Design a protein with these regions (language model features):
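Short loop/turn elements at secondary-structure junctions
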Residues: 47-48, 52-96
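Conserved short "hinge" loops at termini or chain/domain junctions
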Residues: 1-47, 83-96
Length: 96
């Protein structure tokens, strides 16, 4: 999954160890959170898209943790309080 994450982020296959470790940590934390939302069940392979999408969201927010929005020179960014909010219907459907 790390290779897919690098590709989606536009990173080369070979990256420095610190960045690779950061990506692995993001993937691990995202998978753990999804496992919690699934009531302790291991996320099935069909939910890998959720892990990847949320990992991208979390990677792009590095340095802005705790903020709900950010504006600089006319550019405004905002983040959901729950990175999984857009996937809750899929998660509920899986649990049903």
């Amino acid at each position: 999954m790390i290779e897919d994450l690098k590709a989606l982020l536009g990173l080369p296959e070979e990256i420095d160890g610190a960045l690779e470790n950061k990506l692995l940590l993001i993937l691990k934390a995202t998978k753990q959170r999804l496992r919690f939302l699934l009531g302790g069940l291991e996320p099935p392979e069909e939910m890998n898209y959720i892990i990847l999408d949320v990992s991208i969201i979390r990677f792009n927010r590095i340095g802005s943790e705790g903020l709900s929005s950010h504006s600089v020179e006319g550019e405004s960014l905002s983040w959901s309080e729950n990175d999984f909010a857009g996937y809750m219907d899929d998660i509920r459907a899986y649990l049903d």
